[in-house]
A protein has these predicted regions:
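Hydrophobic helical membrane-anchoring modules
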Residues: 78, 91, 96-121
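Conserved core of the sugar-phosphate nucleotidyltransferase
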Residues: 3-93
């Protein structure tokens, strides 16, 4: 996990939310919601109608998974699927969802980490 701004309170709330899941949910995924006009690698719209483009504030969010995952034990033993078959979503705020994949990501995370620990955010 490379989310350096994820705090222990959020992790505790995540575990509590998992423990409170209804029986029909087999996983809890911490996700990063993103709203915008998304296209696939061919340029095909994913979440909007290209003939009638709405403002992004009218679009449903899409979610990036892989931030944190908890699975029911029986599911984890039976499958190698880290998303579950009927997951519930646990949205993270933008700072806590920040992932480090590049040098720029690292520098941005370092900037916000320092600001948070200085009490500025």
């Amino acid at each position: 996990m490379t989310q350096p701004l994820l705090n222990r309170t959020t992790i505790a709330r995540f575990v509590d939310a998992f423990c409170a899941l209804p029986a029909e949910r087999d996983a809890l995924l911490a996700v990063a919601p993103h709203v915008g006009h998304f296209i696939d690698k061919r340029g095909t719209p994913v979440n909007f109608d290209a003939e009638r483009i709405l403002g992004s504030q009218h679009l449903d969010a899409l979610y990036v998974a892989g931030k944190m995952t908890l699975l029911r034990v029986d599911h984890a033993r039976e499958r190698a699927n880290l998303l579950g078959t009927s997951p519930a979503l646990f949205p993270l705020d933008e700072l806590e969802a920040m992932d480090i994949d590049t040098q720029v990501d690292f520098e941005m995370a370092q900037y916000f980490y320092n600001r948070r620990h200085a009490g500025l955010i």
